[in-house]
Amino acid sequence: DPDQIRLHLEVLFAELAPDTSYPDGLLALRFLPPNSGRPIRKLFSWGDRDAAVEMAVRANADGMNGYVGVHPRKPGTSRAGQAADVGRAYWQFVDCDDGAASAKLLELPFSPNFIVTTGTQPTQRLHGYYMLEAPETNMAAYTARQEALATAVGGDNVKDAPRIMRLAGTVSYPSKDKAARGYVPELVT
């Protein structure tokens, strides 16, 4: 769904818009085949977000799983996923890959700014995103909060700043192993 893809990118990367604090930051997209094969990685400027949406639609239609780097990459970055490529964080997030962790996320006394549902079969899977009051440049402090949030809900230990997460508006295609465990292709919303 190109509209959901665009919305997800625009919410995550509002700080890249002109006249904001980080106009030269880059958004990172990655597309992975469900079983094996070559990934596709691409960095986009804020002004190229239409091309980012188009690429996501095409790659997903070709059976690739869509992911987005949660935080912008530094201007001039040519890679997609190294810690040194992320100079500031705008979000804390949590990856709940099972129903128990997803339920705990929804029970926390502080609600996420937004939630991405990555699947419902065989169990509910959610990503919760919390916008920071100010961009974080102390990556050690950021990582410590990521660990605490994951521990609080029993989520995946996704603590690194260059982390990629499922891209809303794309279909999640399970691997053969996951399909055998009851996962089915589902729209990430």
Language-model features: where?
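Secondary-structure transition/turn motif
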Residues: 46, 130-133
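Short loop/turn segments at strand-loop or loop-helix junctions that form parts
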Residues: 30-34, 96-97, 118-120
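A structural signal for short, well-ordered beta-strand segments and their strand-loop junctions
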Residues: 23, 28-30, 116, 157-160, ...
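DNA replication initiation on ssDNA origins
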Residues: 1-90
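Small/flexible residues
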Residues: 8, 32, 43-44, 127, ...
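Short, conserved phosphate-binding/catalytic loop or strand-edge motifs used
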Residues: 115-129, 165
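DNA replication initiation modules
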Residues: 72-109, 132-189
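Extracellular-facing binding/remodeling surfaces
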Residues: 112
